[in-house]
Amino acid sequence: ASLPLIPRRGYDALMTGMLTVGTAVGVWRGGGVNTRIIRDSAADPAMLEPPEGHPEAQIRRAAPPESLADLCADIDELYWAATTGAVIKICRVGTGGARRWLVSMVGTESMRFGSTHNPADIEVNIRLMLGLDSAMGVGLVAALHRAMAADSVPEEQWSSEPVLVCGHSQGGLVASVLASRDPAEAGVNVVGILSTGAPNRRVAVRPDVTIVTVAHDQDVVPSMDGSPDRSPDRRVTVGRTLVRPRKRPLYYAHSSATYTETVRLMERRAAVTPWDRLGKAVAALRAMLPAPGEEARVTHHEIWQDLLEPTAVSTWNTVASLERADPRAVTYPIDYEGARPISATARGIGAAW
């Protein structure tokens, strides 16, 4: 086997090189992806046994969300769950034909340049930028399927159940990649996305998906996808200029807690002008939330990955035959004259901002 052509676009070439070289030298060792329900509001007691060898999750926000800001506030807590893997919150709302699913999803939790049992790491970021399957994407789909199975939803309906994902940073990117694919291919039907601080401008979602992206002017992370500040689809983009804090301004700008407050302000603004694009988009997302008195079931899921062990056999051929990226990044010809689609990039290593 031979290495595929290096993409001509510099950013894609950088990501391809990081994934290829990192895998070759054993930095990226993500393997099989595992999920387990660790809390179920329908169980007694609600807290379930954690995976063997894992600490019990620290969970306090177990009620169904009543607003979009609640979805974001749930993410604030999930970052502090203190588990081995990443924790996401899934809420089933309604029954029968009115049934829908709400997901709160964290962003990057491990900033180490190397794989850990927590798949919300840099490898996932790189693979998502190249349009490849990632551990968190696989884990989210598996967790949703597990929640649907626990709720006795027939397997043939899993890919058609409507899902709203609220994702911070990497979580918003994972949701966008899934929403760019046909539901039958993705395994889930993402119909709504609220992304906060996510570098997802290079991914165009399906036309039937309602997506609101929130980005602070001082937050550098949304610009880390190598794409200009433009909308590749019909998304509604919300910005906010922050007052500089006394310390740690970059952390403050990207903090999930800061975005929770911004989303709360956004909902108030949308309530005042419900007729404009933002008002209509927010109304569409809020329609997924539980109505007063509507039945809901909340489950928390831990997602973790196995780590591949080095072998004595050369893995060069595995690294050299990486898969074609799909979906491909959005190209803006005015900014990248002479650019062409990625011909071939990375495939096939691991299961997996």
Predicted regions and their residues:
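Gly/Ala-rich beta-loop-alpha elbow adjacent to hydrolase catalytic centers
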Residues: C166-A179
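Alpha/beta hydrolase fold serine-hydrolase catalytic domain that processes acyl esters and thioesters
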Residues: A1-E161, P183-W353
